[in-house]
């Protein structure tokens, strides 16, 4: 329940722009969220390895 309430709190429009923050759409994590994908680095890594994010693959050079 705590994560659901935090997601609702984050979705509200804040009076000051500094108070806005991103939260992972999948797990609700507030830190290390990739804005382009809307998910945190942990979920991004998991989905990338599973091949669920089109165009993303592990780098090798």
From Swiss-Prot:
The Swiss-Prot or TrEMBL record lists the needed cofactor(s) as: Zn(2+)
List the molecular function annotations (GO) for this entry: rRNA binding; structural constituent of ribosome; zinc ion binding
Which residues are listed for Zn(2+) binding in this entry? 24, 27, 40, 43
Keywords, alphabetical: Metal-binding, Ribonucleoprotein, Ribosomal protein, RNA-binding, rRNA-binding, Zinc
For this UniProt entry, what's an example GO CC term?
cytoplasm
Any keyword Ion transport? no
Cofactor note, please? Binds 1 zinc ion per subunit.
Note the coiled coil stretches, chain numbering: none
Record-level GO BP terms: translation
Tell me which SUPFAM superfamilies the record gives: Glucocorticoid receptor-like (DNA-binding domain)
This protein's record includes keyword Transmembrane helix:
no
Quaternary context: Part of the 30S ribosomal subunit. Contacts proteins S3 and S10.
Query: What does the record give as the function of this protein?
Result: Binds 16S rRNA, required for the assembly of 30S particles and may also be responsible for determining the conformation of the 16S rRNA at the A site.
Family under the similarity heading: Belongs to the universal ribosomal protein uS14 family. Zinc-binding uS14 subfamily.
**HAMAP family given in the database record:** Ribosomal_uS14_2_B
**Protein name (Swiss-Prot/TrEMBL):** Small ribosomal subunit protein uS14
The species this protein belongs to is Mesoplasma florum (strain ATCC 33453 / NBRC 100688 / NCTC 11704 / L1)
